[in-house]
Amino acid sequence: METALAKTPQKRQVMFLAILLLLWEAGSEAVRYSIPEETESGYSVANLAKDLGLGVGELATRGARMHYKGNKELLQLDIKTGNLLLYEKLDREVMCGATEPCILHFQLLLENPVQFFQTDLQLTDINDHAPEFPEKEMLLKIPESTQPGTVFPLKIAQDFDIGSNTVQNYTISPNSHFHVATHNRGDGRKYPELVLDKALDREERPELSLTLTALDGGAPPRSGTTTIRIVVLDNNDNAPEFLQSFYEVQVPENSPLNSLVVVVSARDLDAGAYGSVAYALFQGDEVTQPFVIDEKTAEIRLKRALDFEATPYYNVEIVATDGGGLSGKCTVAIEVVDVNDNAPELTMSTLSSPTPENAPETVVAVFSVSDPDSGDNGRMICSIQNDLPFLLKPTLKNFYTLVTQRTLDRESQAEYNITITVTDMGTPRLKTEHNITVLVSDVNDNAPAFTQTSYTLFVRENNSPALHIGSVSATDRDSGTNAQVTYSLLPPQNPHLRLASLVSINADNGHLFALRSLDYEALQAFEFRVGATDRGSPALSSEALVRVLVLDANDNSPFVLYPLQNGSAPCTELVPRAAEPGYLVTKVVAVDGDSGQNAWLSYQLLKATEPGLFSMWAHNGEVRTARLLSERDAAKHRLVVLVKDNGEPPRSATATLHVLLVDGFSQPYLPLPEAAPAQAQADSLTVYLVVALASVSSLFLFSVLLFVAVRLCRRSRAAPVGRCSVPEGPFPGHLVDVSGTGTLSQSYHYEVCLTGDSGAGEFKFLKPIIPNLLPQGAGEEIGKTAAFRNSFGLN
């Protein structure tokens, strides 16, 4: 074991110190008090706080308490007054035995911060025990030929008191033959001897009975008695004599039972029965003596296990008696040799668990160690595991503190299992292990952490109020209230974003709710920040970005920009009967307020006066002729166009077109709405068209006047077709005829009717001057077009 320990020098070992090691604030001298033994419990020994210079309030705030080996509660500290009280009645003989002085060592422990004070309590002896002889009767056999002055040893009386309270004198009942002499032994005890004063005469008195009294020195004195019975024998000339009057021997405490301790020897010069010697223990106390002697061989053997820690030394008196009753005495001093038969003991005084994680050099535990063995067998070392953030520090004698070596981290390790190993230096080495569990208490050193730095949430527009749109989540590595997270909305960076009216957050679980119905067309996306705050002190927080994207719903129907469907006079498109198939009649223009596929528009010719005459392109809204026109086709046609989006479910709108088939363009006027009072500001579309068409207004007016003049001159050659229901003559002053401008191809003429009170413009395709499509019979069409242009005198 020694080799194994020597191979681990890296272990933090704290060597046991024989002298007092002082804590940083502890004094070097102990405070000593003295009280008589058997003092009643509750007795106030002293005001300890005053004697140590401590405030009374300091005792309570610093967790003061008394400590005695084995954590026995013998003294009690009143932390309110500072008085040191006797917890129970103390018996000096039980606490210390024959040891003098009897001093009990206490420690005053202050836990916050850790500080020790040594306190000694001396128990003074009182005369509470009377002397007591080991036997009620002692037998002496004395030959009648014994000369006066002969001394006969007597057994001593036991008195558990010490000092003057123990046996001080022996007396004997009055008689004419003997007196008692009192002598001091080497250990301080007094022993009696019976001295013959007058020769005995067996024929006169064969037996005597005397009373031996032992007196102690107490006040008042106590006494004990025994009877000495003396038998007078015939002549026996010689008493037994030991070869040595004093024997010294050492016996290991772990010696087996019945092992031989020593052999004594005595001789008697007489012959026969008077020379036969028998041996016995003089005191003969079977209770206290762990030895036995063979009466014939004088072998002293061990009859009960020895314990160095209980009794390290014995004085055994041996008496040798011959057949005639004469005796001799010797003393055997037996020293019990200590062996390492006791493992160290560890007594935990205080354990602070849990321990804050942010407090280095915090005292976690205070404990004491002891080993009743002596020498190296009682020297100890303490150690803990090498991989722990803790240190052992010696304080007072046999006391250690376990402190944190550095700042702990509860999130990394919430508890530590520490094994304190106490090993003595004996052979073989014995050790004791004590396991403690240290819990690490949480400190708010971790801010909440979101599972994502940013969140993207999707909400379909037209949602119901209080709709749960998503959640954010944050975790805190701390524990308890330090890990309880509260969520909140942070003020938006955009001052125009009314966040409080858009969303709310559940403070406990991070659920986000839309407070009102969202409109994609008004707000496509917005972002804000959420905060997560724990409930520690001080509180820590973090934040995350939340983006909310509003998904479009098909909540807007297509809106037809052209032709306008505002209840005013319908627009009429003029189509020459000579138009080829695929001739562009007009183009329906529509928009949809939605986005994506909800705004993908398709066009469909829903109704027609003559099905098959016109066709409509589904994707661009162009209305074209589907075949050649004939004289049999009606002049007026009404087309209903369906404009449908691609949403789910789809939404639609309809537009009505009027088409007029013409052979020429004599008076191609259409009924116009009544003029209205001028309006201060036109519609944005009207303004755009007016600005675009005003640049060519003069050319258009000139063309119209020229057209009217030609028609009047050649009425006979061209019949009037498609007459508009407006008075002939110049246009009213609030109407402007525009040609070759607009959002469609420049090859078209437009008639724009602007009303001063409507705030909107109406425009209509009349007919193309030069067709923008050349069908298969391109040459023939060009020829007809040239003739047509000649009819207007445009070449």
UniProtKB/Swiss-Prot annotation:
Keywords: Acetylation, Calcium, Cell adhesion, Cell membrane, Glycoprotein, Membrane, Repeat, Signal, Transmembrane, Transmembrane helix
Sugar-modified residues: 169, 417, 435, 566
SUPFAM superfamilies: Cadherin-like (SSF49313)
Residues exposed to the Cytoplasmic side: 711-795
Classification via PROSITE patterns: CADHERIN_1, CADHERIN_2
Compartments, as annotated in UniProt: Cell membrane
Residues in compartment: Extracellular: 31-689
Transmembrane segments: 690-710
GO cellular component terms, semicolon-separated: membrane; plasma membrane; synapse
GO biological process assignments: calcium-dependent cell-cell adhesion via plasma membrane cell adhesion molecules; cell adhesion; chemical synaptic transmission; homophilic cell adhesion via plasma membrane adhesion molecules; synapse assembly
Signal peptide stretch: 1-30
GO molecular function, one term: calcium ion binding
Family annotation (InterPro entries): Cadherin-like_dom, Cadherin-like_sf, Cadherin_C, Cadherin_CS, Cadherin_N, Protocadherin/Cadherin-CA
All copies of domain Cadherin, residue ranges: 35-133, 138-242, 247-346, 351-450, 455-560, 567-670
Pfam families with a match to the protein in the record: Cadherin (PF00028), Cadherin_2 (PF08266), Cadherin_C_2 (PF16492)
N6-acetyllysine sites (modified residues): 296
Membrane topology: Single-pass type I membrane protein
Function: Potential calcium-dependent cell-adhesion protein. May be involved in the establishment and maintenance of specific neuronal connections in the brain.
Entry protein name: Protocadherin beta-5
